Amino acid sequence: MTGGRLVALLLLVAASLGLGQQPHPEPGLPGLQYSYDCGMRGMQLVVLPRPGRTIRFKVVDEFGNRFEVNNCSICFHWVSAEPQAPAVFSADYKGCHVLEKEGHSHLTVFIEAMLPDGHVEVAQEAVLICPKPGHTWAVGSHQVPPTTPSPTTPHALPFHLSSAHTFPIPLYLEHSLMLPTPAGPSLGPGPTPAVLAQVERWEVDKPDAVGSHLPQEWCQVASGHIPCIVQSSSKEACEQAGCCYDSAREVPCYYGNTATVQCFRNGYFILVVAQEMALAHRITLANVHLAYAPTRCPPAQKTSAFVIFHVPLTHCGTTVQVLGSQLFYENQLVSDIDVREGPQGSITRDSSFRLLVRCIFNASDFLPIQASIFSPPLPAPVTQAGPLRLELRIARDETFSSFYEEEDYPLVRLLREPVHVEVRLLQRTDPSLVLELHQCWATPSANPVQQPQWPLLSDGCPFKGDSYRTRVLALDRAELPFRSHYQRFTVATFTFLDSGAQRALRGLVYFFCSASACHPSGPETCSSTCSSRTAKRRRSSGYHDGTPRALDIVSSPGPVGFQDSHRQEPTLESTGSGRNSNPKPLLWVVLLLLAIALVLGIGVFVGLSQAWAHKLREGHRLTDQAQ
């Protein structure tokens, strides 16, 4: 026994001599105890701070610039620094500022020990080289070998995992999380170490994931059951979503006494934390919040038993990175400690808590999307007087699908044959503008004020003095982009008469219209009805009271000429409108009278001839008898 103690004492002395060979920090400044290890995917630096100190990490780039380290999925940096626990910095070999030199990964980290007032107590630079050149630990003032092997994942704090807590996908769920179990017994007084949830990639077609569910003790929710979001109400779908199922309850599928995360393809994830889990980890449920958006993204729902977060994948501090054909979305849920201040000190009974949430999606999947495109509002129109560009054209038929060109004029029409006229507003895209026709008329020349004239529309309505009234056509809403910019009407072909001789003027007819653009304002509208009151109100805009302004008048590209089917010019016996006369019956009457007169004349002539011949014969006979 004495020999064994002597051997142990000699070993301790040898170890002390070995430690004495290492460099010491400057006098009066405590050294930093740190170590690092190399894993399969990254490197990990562990620093043991003195009580009351916090550790801050900074990475150094190849030019010597220092950058403070935070949890960053883009740079593959993770930091964990909890009270009375080692400060851990993890970096992936593909992370930011990791340099490749001769087959080794080099990362320079600047370590600072911070006092409670924010000042730096001591700072030290550490160079991490993986794979390590040897198995010697980097040393500060004391050599502290690792007590446990480092995990290969970048999350270094101690945590407990159970494969039974993993649940497969619910509605649109791509991957699920390994949830933390209740913390084990504390090794000493004070707050317990932080518990960090580990994220595992869970393939959809993994056979042992189907049917996995929460332990029965986690489903003993006393009150305030929160319905779980699932695609169907079946037990299998509920359990695969990581929720509890009880057919005897009013809400058969509900969240259990744990932390449940559901990632949805439509752009958000749901995080539910139970009161029982908060008690197990010695935290206050009301103090749980998102780490990067504590005020902007509060819980969507709070009850006495649960806190529910509805987090968009693109907001609330959620980070995203692309690795191969996968998208990684990450966020963190933390809990602030509840501090009680007394007259001579402050205490807390809360532990620290940090839950890393990660949703993994396949970037190569084809998913349906629904997009709503909202056109920007049109600018407010400016109403003022100005020139209008109008066009009057004649259609080939009643469909108004094609129109005559300038080279087609003059057009030839039979009397009473319809002429299809369209007036439209050019170079205007304001849908609220309304084209209004005031007066439309016809003249025998290209001069709009030449006499004679015949009205087609009076105050926008068909002229009532015509037995063949102009027909104003309604426009189909679907056939024109700006329906209110068009006006159409149909005219029966006619010809002008010589007022003196009452004979048809064999000439051309030109069409004209006066128009304006109306813009509604306030309760007033631009719609008009063809009534006597409207005609009186708008009478002043017609050409009867004067010559209309040139900018308001539009004419047809060319004239329209009429053609009589019998190629003869009728002479009319009756007075009235040339359009009320029909030359065909009058012609037959004249011809009939001429025929009768001719027959009578011939009969009279023949009778008289025979009478004179009889008298001559009687005269000759009497003469012969006298001789």
UniProtKB/Swiss-Prot annotation:
Extracellular side: 21-585
GO annotations of cellular component type: egg coat; extracellular region; plasma membrane
Pyrrolidone carboxylic acid modification, residue list: Q21
Residue ranges crossing the lipid bilayer per the database entry: 586-606
Compositionally biased residues, Polar residues: 571-580
Domain P-type span(s) in chain numbering: 217-257
Domain notes from UniProt: The ZP domain is involved in the polymerization of the ZP proteins to form the zona pellucida.
This protein's name: Zona pellucida sperm-binding protein 1
Organism: Oryctolagus cuniculus (Rabbit)
